[in-house]
Amino acid sequence: YSLIHDDLPCMDNDDLRRGKPTNHKRFGECTATLAGDALQAAAFETILTAPLPAEVNVAAGLTLARGAGALGMCGGQQLDMEGETRIFTLKEVARMNQLKTGCLLNAACVMGVLAAGVPMDDPMVAAAERYAKVIGLAFQVRDDMLNVTSTEEEMGKPVGNDIESHKSTYV
């Protein structure tokens, strides 16, 4: 859902994703917004109705809510938009990307550990969080670099748009 919202004209305004027209280009902005919202609701429904102990479902749902919310992906997306109006420090870029990308990866990793029956206070949860943070950073640095060094054909989406939009990136 987050990528559908990220492609909208009010966010990144991307026309292509993986070489295909973005949802809002194919179906319109209203449908794309609703599709993103519906996918988010479906994620919570899937978590809360999974055949797991109730306390695991609740912990997983809370993990996703925190990862997606104002102190997670949504907060990072807001910083991303603010990064178009001023130049961020490297520390601010790192914070933005940790929220924008890292928090949902963190939620996915932690929910996997929880679904395996590991309690929240187990060191495995902290290990999953560290893993997600490093993977999120690597993904974002690579994505930022490819945005200036790659081609639209290679990426399946426009490149160079971060510079055009004056976005704060690792590059």
Predicted segments with their positions:
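All-alpha prenyltransferase/terpene-synthase fold signal
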Residues: 1-171
